[in-house]
């Protein structure tokens, strides 16, 4: 099973995310990664292999920030490679997400999105969700002239996920809303925690304890 963890607060998000991913190792996985808001961008670091290998990557090529998401992947679509590891990026980088579950209609959605000009860099079903959310966000901005607000981000996730067939749990970052994580689920577990000036999301309560 895949593992998801997310954090908004005042601590170094990378430290919390890595600790959370270690606590989710019991679920089984073949790769791991994190995405953190860092100097105005969403910085993604990911590796095929164990969380300890991701630890070493962060030690040498770390990112500092107080908002981020993390993931451990057990491959169901696509090989076990660095590029297929989560998090995945949608559109032109405006959406970054992690996903637990299976997108049963990913082939048809991939074809539709490729027709619209979206370029796929992985062989995963998850990248379909990232591009789909980005598409609805871009369409909303073009149609309404609306900037990327919290409300808009929530609504485009809702719109995109209605087109997904299968089970899912997702945690989504938006480049232009650096204080927001949108989480959604259907059939895959997610838990939410609220602390003093901190907010958490995870596949189970393990990363939230302590």
Regions found by a protein language model. Give the residues of each.
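Conserved short alpha-helical segments that host acidic/polar catalytic motifs at enzyme active sites
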Residues: 1-210
């Amino acid at each position: 099973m895949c593992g998801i963890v997310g954090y908004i607060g005042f601590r170094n998000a990378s430290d919390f995310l890595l600790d959370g991913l270690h606590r989710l190792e019991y679920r089984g996985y073949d790769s791991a990664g994190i995405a953190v808001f860092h100097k105005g961008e969403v910085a993604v670091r990911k590796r095929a292999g164990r969380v300890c290998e991701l630890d070493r990557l962060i030690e040498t090529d770390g990112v500092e920030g107080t908002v981020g998401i993390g993931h451990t992947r057990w491959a169901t679509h696509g090989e076990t490679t660095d590029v297929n590891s989560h998090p995945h990026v949608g559109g032109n980088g405006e959406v970054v997400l992690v996903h637990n579950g299976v997108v049963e209609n990913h082939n048809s959605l991939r074809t539709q999105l490729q027709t619209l000009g979206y370029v796929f860099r992985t062989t995963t079903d998850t990248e379909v969700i990232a591009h789909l959310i980005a598409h609805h966000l871009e369409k909303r901005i073009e149609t309404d002239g609306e900037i990327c607000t919290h409300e808009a981000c929530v609504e485009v996730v809702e719109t995109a996920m209605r087109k997904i067939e299968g089970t899912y749990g997702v945690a989504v970052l938006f480049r232009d809303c650096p204080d927001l994580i949108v989480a959604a689920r259907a059939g895959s577990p997610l838990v939410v925690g609220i602390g003093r000036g901190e907010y958490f999301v995870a596949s189970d309560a393990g990363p939230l304890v302590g």
